């Protein structure tokens, strides 16, 4: 699980550890770099290690192909699933530093895909993303305003969630 100390990644670690799986987590606490000490995921990492005996953490940047390859070589065919949650998390930072943003989000992902193909091609690769990829298109859905929340009508094809068929074309993004 990449981004294993982030919001979604840490939940995946807890879920699969509690199901009895051995979980390898990769996270380099990039949030601290972007957001300072208040963005650090060190406490989350320490809690994951303390509470999940089947969890092994590696402090690796997904842009570092050689470091990632060491992990893939170590676990090889024991890798039964890859959940990719790692990303450059700051949209404002991405606007100001687009090359770094691209290197983490695109090149890092490509590293993982290539290594998965080489060492465990039969294993599913789940790529997590952000709602930001949809830009303003979700705002065009026909919502119902309730007392405490907005909902989509039950007969809407996206009632149970938005999947990969939802268009990201011709929409505004973070900048």
Give residue spans per PLM region.
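N-terminal Rossmann-like NAD(P)+-binding domain of SDR-like oxidoreductases, especially those catalyzing
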Residues: 1-175
């Amino acid at each position: 699980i990449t981004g294993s100390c982030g919001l979604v990644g840490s939940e995946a670690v807890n879920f699969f550890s509690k199901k009895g799986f051995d979980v390898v987590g990769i996270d380099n606490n990039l949030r601290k770099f972007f957001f300072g000490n208040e963005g650090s995921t060190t406490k989350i990492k320490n809690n994951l290690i303390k509470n999940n005996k089947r969890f092994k953490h590696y402090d690796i940047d997904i842009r570092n192909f050689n470091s990632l390859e060491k992990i893939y070589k170590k676990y090889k065919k024991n890798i039964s699933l890859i959940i990719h949650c790692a990303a450059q998390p700051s949209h404002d930072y991405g606007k100001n530093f687009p090359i770094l943003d691209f290197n983490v989000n695109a090149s890092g992902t490509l590293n993982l895909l290539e290594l998965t193909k080489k060492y465990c091609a039969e294993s599913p690769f789940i790529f997590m993303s952000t709602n930001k990829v949809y830009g303003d298109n979700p705002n065009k859905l026909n919502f119902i305003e309730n007392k405490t929340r907005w909902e989509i009508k039950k007969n809407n094809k996206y009632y149970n969630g938005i999947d990969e068929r939802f268009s990201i074309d011709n929409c505004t993004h973070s900048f």
